[in-house]
Amino acid sequence: MIKRIIYVILLINAVFVISGCNSRNPIISIKTEMGNINVELYADRAPVTVANFLKYTDSSLFMNSCFYRVVRPDNQPHDSVKIEVIQGGRLDETGGFSPIIHETTSMTGVLHSDGVISMARLGPGSATSEFFICVGDQPSLDYGGKRNRDGQGFAAFGRVISGMEVVRRIYALPVPTQYLEKKVTTYNISRIK
């Protein structure tokens, strides 16, 4: 009986150790004037997109960037497929890096659910430093979704692990159009881990 108890305790400890060591994914902090948003980046599932985001992060190119766009059902009168996101990044694209290949959600398995971070883009292969965070589930942004005519969706690459209350406060700001009159300053984006 004692051997069984010891075995169960060792098994439980092993599970905790394995699960704790399993996440080698980087964690970044988006430091805004409204609070911090911490995000786990899924380097194991979206390696190209995460490497690109970290290149901007490590080069301090997100310093003094902003959240400038809030997309809600009430400010998309002409869009048949409505989404809910906050968008940020570098409005000044000078000094940035080349666009990256498009890692679709069908390739990565990272779907646009509540708190997921994803790259903004015009066409496939055009993403650089603009990103958005989903407020609620947004399946129309996944591969095969109807938000983009090309059906390729957007490149989701991580999830908010703390600070969704900050995301929701930004989302709730008054915005007559999709673009904030007073942008929310992002002081910096840096690695935590």
Please identify what each model-predicted range represents.
Residues 1-9:
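Bacterial N-terminal signal peptides that target proteins for export
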Residues 2, 16-193:
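Cyclophilin-like peptidyl-prolyl cis-trans isomerases
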Residues 8-17:
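Bacterial N-terminal signal peptides
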